[in-house]
Amino acid sequence: IAQCKAGIIGSFPCLNAREGEGEPNMLEIWLKKINEELDKHNQENPDSPAAPYAVNHIVHKSNVRLEKDIDICAKWGAPVWITSLGARPEVNEVAHQAKGIVLHDIINNFFAKKAIDKGADGLVAVAAGAGGHAGTLSPFALIQEIREWFSGPLLLSGSIANGGAVLAAQAM
């Protein structure tokens, strides 16, 4: 919420909204609070609206919560959906029906093309140095390769540790 109020997209992993049997759905509680807080901020600060928030979804077949989680995100109008571990057109369709955009985590050009072919709106290039993730390619090589064929939204993660690296990434 604080990031969004500061003008930066704030995100969280959907699976962090844990719930126990018989307990209220934490994801629903979180999204309600986020929407209320950001709506209030926007009403009080019309000249400085909040940035959108993003919800990260693991779309791998092993995620038994996926269907329920995407229904909740659609209900609350999550504006940005970040997907990873599988390009799933049906998830993209639900996001689009809810007026959201989909950014898909990719580690190479093959998966980038696959994600766009299956309906993602943009890409998150997970490069070497993206703490704990699978990216192995240089961020600058990966961005350059993707930009040869894709002009849509492209985010970069990995090995960006100072202003010079941010400037270099922006130049690409």
Regions found by a protein language model. Name each.
Residues L167-M172:
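A compact, surface-exposed functional segment
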Residues I1-L155:
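Active-site entrance/lid segments in N-terminal catalytic domains of soluble metabolic enzymes
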